[in-house]
Amino acid sequence: MTQVHFTLKSEEIQSIIEYSVKDDVSKNILTTVFNQLMENQRTEYIQAKEYERTENRQSQRNGYYERSFTTRVGTLELKVPRTRDGHFSPTVFERYQRNEKALMASMLEMYVSGVSTRKVSKIVEELCGKSVSKSFVSSLTEQLEPMVNEWQNRLLSEKNYPYLMTDVLYIKVREENRVLSKSCHIAIGITKDGDREIIGFMIQSGESEETWTTFFEYLKERGLQGTELVISDAHKGLVSAIRKSFTNVSWQRCQVHFLRNIFTTIPKKNSKSFREAVKGIFKFTDINLAREAKNRLIHDYIDQPKYSKACASLDDGFEDAFQYTVQGNSHNRLKSTNLIERLNQEVRRREKIIRIFPNQTSANRLIGAVLMDLHDEWIYSSRKYINFDK
């Protein structure tokens, strides 16, 4: 049988390995290279060749043990050299540990990105030749829990968040053989420099003044401060909680929701001129000009029965819908909850693989991990969300 001999240094062999993996050489050749590399490293550790008599000898050879090693070309079965003193450890397995950690991190990343545990297991097996069970992937995701909890409860007192945007996302959770609807309250904070951050989330039993007050107190207990404007839809419980939790703070009613509410009170047919007139009001970024336009519209349409309810609704909610022009430097990104609506859509896209969470803990873990991921994208972005200088 042909013998393969290596005359290269360990560093050179390591370099060959790295390039070999990239070139998809056969597993047999790569196994031979790894085994020879480890043999060379044992010789260097002992400072004596096999059967060599020398005063520099540090230990004795002590056979081998088998160990699996996962690479991009598949799983290799290696013969790992041992020494009598038990202190020798090939550098290959320092890389192995990093490889394993990278593989696990990749599995977690796939999970957070919206890949089911079944698909994660299949992808890992196809890429690495290594079989992992769905239960292993599920248990691995539990490692996210302490990270999510720490992030979810981090202090907010280092910054001021003058602009606070809130919304709720509904999910399904299994409890005692029942499938229940749960509300995930989410808050985005925008700094005076125009940076956006996801500053908190909390899963509760529903949307009411009580649950929103609990959520706001959770934010304040973590150090939320400097709030000047809260942007949200007009859910009664939410608005009441805002008034209760944030005194001397303005509320910006989401203009998108407000327009939608107004238009639901008018006929779909033969109402184009009224619709365009209402939309025109919301193009103003000066509250005084908008107010004048609103008053003219009401004067023109209030006596028409089919528009009377819409006019009353517009008049009643107008001031709240234009608070961003007073407290938000009239910046268009503060006049609606579009930002948090898009965030919810991204969370929904990733969590829909679950459909029904087995318990609230798993829901908190996945949604928290997704929000952490999106939060990192925001804070490391080179672009500000709002440029208040313009």
Curated annotation (Swiss-Prot):
GO terms for molecular function: DNA binding; transposase activity. It holds the Pfam family Transposase_mut. InterPro entries: Transposase_mutator. It comes from the Bacteria. Keywords: DNA recombination, DNA-binding, Plasmid, Transposable element, Transposition. One of its GO terms (biological process) is DNA transposition. Required for the transposition of the insertion element. Belongs to the transposase mutator family. This is Transposase for insertion sequence element IS256 in transposon Tn4001.
